Structure formats: structure tokens, C-alpha cells
Amino acid sequence: MKYEGIDLICVPGACAALTALVSSGLPSSSFIFEGFLPKKQIDREKILLQISKNEKTTLIYESPRRLKKLLKELLEFCGGDREIMVARELTKKFEEHVGDNINEVVEFFREKDIIGEITIVIKGIKKGDLNIDKFSIKKDLHDLMNAGLSLSAASKYLAKKNGVK
């Protein structure tokens, strides 16, 4: 490629997303890179819902001060057993890889002060395997009905939220 008569070439360099994907051991033949999730809650929830249903491995960047919030959201949307790996400070002196499932990662970071650049790798679900937490669904249904929704309206809302037809 030329720009103003000068040949341009691409020089490969470190990429946190790909480094985290490879080091996670999670499926890497097909993946989705989300980058940083939007701050606007409705947009965030839309993407989190997509991640919860996705069969492909998902890569996310997150800031240290927002990591705990994101992990809590992933727990809510994907369930605690979903495989995940949180990589911090890749290719640096204090590189760290934490993961097995969302429950364990949430517990690991619960009381920690988090610093550094963070990349999260989330395993996709198996085809046809929607991860629905029945306890959470019942709690959500109860909360919605206490807020004044009818059983029918609350059920329709939760079905849509969880991708159940």
C-alpha cells in the first residue's frame, strides 16, 4: 500500500486479545472480539445477552476499576459454571491468568485491589445448550410480580431476556 508515495507495511506486534485467547486454552478456531463493552446499561445488557447465548469464544477488554462489575454481570447473564479466563498485565512482569469458571474468578477478585490491563476470555456454549439458572429466573419472576407485573407479562419478559421461545 502506498500513502503519499511512501510504501507502508504492517509490523506485527503483541495483541492482548490474541495472547489471552491462546493462553486460555479455550476454543480458538472461531471467536468474537467485543473490545470494551459500552457504558450505557441497555447497550451493555444487549451484548451480555448475546455473549450468554453465543457458541463462539468471546474476548473482552475491561478496566481494572470496572472488572468486578463486569464479572457480576457475567455471573448473572452466563451463570457461574461458564468457563472463563481473566488475563492481566500480559507480557509484563506481573502477568497473571485467573480462571476456570465465573464463580471461581468472582471469588478470586472479590477482596483484591485490581490494577493493570485486563483481557477476559469466555467460552461459548455448546450448540443447543442454553444456560438458564432456574433459581435466578424464579427470583426475577418474584421481583417482577412484586413490582406490579402480571405473571403473564413477567414470564414473557423473562423468556425474551433469556432467549426462550
Where are these regions (language model features)?
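Class I SAM-dependent methyltransferase SAM-binding "motif I" and its flanking Rossmann-like core
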Residues: K2-N54
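A contiguous loop/helix-start segment that scaffolds small-molecule binding in enzyme catalytic cores
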Residues: T57, P64-V164
